[in-house]
Amino acid sequence: MEKTRSKSKLKTVLIVLGIVVFAIALGIFVFLKQSFLKTFPELEGEPEIGKWYDIPVAGATSSDGSEWHGIFRKGTENKAVIYFFGGGVSITPETSEGGKEFYATSMLAQDFVAQGGVGSSAENNPFKDWSFIVIPYATGDFHAGTGIYEGKKTVYHTGYSNYSAYIEQIKPYVGEPDTLLVTGFSAGGFATSLLADDVIGRFPSAENVTVCVDSSLLLYDGWHDTAVYLWKTPTEISDRLTTDNLVLDSLTALHEKRGSSVKILFDCSYRDDTLMQYQSYIDNGKMDRTKELGDSFQRDLKEMVNGLRTNIPDVGIYIWCSGEDADTHNTQHTIISYNVFDKLGNDRSVGEWIFDAVNNDVKSYGLELLDKAF
């Protein structure tokens, strides 16, 4: 009798434990599906105002050959944000084959990112009622490639092909916007500089155009060759790359072509912890993050800012500090997808600074950080 009772108790305990484990697993799954693994519904018919959608694009691929889609939200205002996501880069055949070590290879978590920062529906977000055309990033080519790398594995550097097909597909839902903000973070910031002129040409009705590059500085003598031979970037884009500074080359060319009709902005934290790691790989073949690398990045950033202000006299600059490490003083990478409305010790947040520029009030903040010493 006692043995029967013991077995019954053990069975009950195991059932309870099983229920608890299942509940925890279910809770984790639900949390992930509502956050990191969130996916939007596919657009069917006319879009509902303020609702996010995934937009399947025929033939579009991520670098690993899996599906790629655009992300879209229709707003109430006749204004549009063209928003390039980031996530690393490939600059050589070796980094192409390295895949996830160097760049995002699939669409994992990209829907979730769209709702943060500048894309949020928060009341204090002046862009909350704009239409958003989001270009996710999973091709390792700064959204600028049309090529397929064939080595030990096949890698699709087809970011430009994806972007251009998606833009043409979604344009009928946007109409003819009178105001355009072209922006992107990290690799998407590099893409913003490379593709802003292309974007502007696709929306000729927009008379008020602002271009903002967030956290994009890497110095590399091989940018032109990478664009031509690895990514297979369209010639009109790769021809602009004549120095080791892709963003400076591209924004300078944009200003020379478009003049004062396009307001150009650049922001970056003054000791960007992620960019310095990639710069270390370019320079030394190894990613690293040290105080010395932070010092070097800070010097490079100062030179970059000086170049922008020389070549584009009316450029707006925002140098900021957030998430500073107590020992190395290295800082957060990118801001527009996250804490873009934090003041960061200035009169205006990065988000407000961008919106001010849209309204023809272009200013600069935080330049004193470029000379901060430790």
Positions of predicted regions on the chain:
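N-terminal Lys/Arg-rich, disordered targeting/topogenic segments
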Residues: 1-10
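C-terminal His-loop and adjacent cap/lid subdomain of alpha/beta-hydrolase
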Residues: 12-19, 24-183, 190-374
